[in-house]
Amino acid sequence: MTRAPSGPGVRAALALAMASALILLGARPSRAEYTLQQSTQPGAHYHSPQDFAVQVTFGPYRPDVDSEFSMPRHPYLDYFGDGKNLLTQAQFDYQVFHKMGTVAIGLGAGFFRVSGSSPVASNPAQPSGDRSTLTVVPVSLSGVYRFDYYLERDGFPIVPHAKLGLDWAYWQITDGNGEIARAAGGRARGGTLGWHAAIGVALVLDFLDPTAARDFDVEMGVNHTALVFEFGHYDISGLGRSNRMHLGDDTWTMGLMFEF
């Protein structure tokens, strides 16, 4: 068997090769460091994977309870007045398609509560000392389309969107003691099915501070932060079923959205 060459020259060459390899491996950046270096180079654009969106919005809401009653009956007006109160909503989107815009499936939930004085039975226009509270918790499943093609290509910050979906809203009425009220031999709570359609627009805030937006993406994976405005028609009246509490409204909401 031929013996491998050895000697001072060979050993020196091997030592030099090993030292060079160690230096190169030690100097090589990790994937995250490489990404950060690339993203901070002049003119570079970093974009982490984008699969989800979360938005939180607020807006005025007045459930259309009185639409199911014939005149002159208007129990919501008698109990809670004709004003609108705050509706808080949150939605989580799973983005399934990115080409000429973004298509997503969204799951949302909201919360609304209003309190008022019960009217005197003999004179509905006169409030009594008894308090009643209506609580509504709407849940929605939506198909969402956002036209963000020019945002991704050119950084244009205005992104319109459209939404269509189904709703189910839980409702309950409690008395002044916080207990579920009773009416017509039953308990004053239930659920109503419905549907909604909405259009809106988002102002993506990345342009205000591109460096901070890029760092937010690199470090936290948040691709975009945006102000969102939306106007929607909510028909939550039972999808044709009778004897359901009507909880729909035409209203607007505004809030923040994060894509990641």
Please provide the spans of the model-predicted regions:
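Extracellular/periplasm-exposed beta-strand and loop segments of Gram-negative cell-envelope proteins
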Residues: 63-84, 112-139, 170-193, 240-246
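Cleavable N-terminal export/targeting peptides
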Residues: 1-48
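Predominantly the C-terminal beta-signal and adjacent terminal strand-loop region
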Residues: 200-260
